[in-house]
Amino acid sequence: MPEALEKWDCNLVQQLLPAVYDIILRIEEQFMTEMYQKGVDKAQANRMKLVQDGMVHMARIAVYASAHTNGVAAIHTEILKDSVLKDWYQVYPERFQNKTNGITQRRWLALCNPELSGLLTELLGSDDWKIHLDDLKQLERYA
């Protein structure tokens, strides 16, 4: 998941968005003060810096500024907690959670696509598929 951890060159941010960059630096200062107050050791706090090695770390800013960090699927949340954002989880364990943001067949088919919903009901002989998604396997005979 490191590919999801977006970083921006400090010079670019400073050149294009100087006021935003100043705010980021103030947030960084506040963050480091908070880490000191929480008793986070210096090595860990340095690994968590919002601005590091000439880059603004957007995911770190997001975790710091947010009340919750959602891994969506349970396995992704565990990856975040165990490796990708491990330092952050150690400091803010209460913020990490997972809530799957998926759609349901009832919502997508029955409400958003009534024509397809009608066809499925017609082919299957009832609308039980809206409750029992496995009923859709009966459609394989039409494939």
Spell out what each predicted region is:
Residues 1-143:
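A conserved ligand/cofactor-binding region detector
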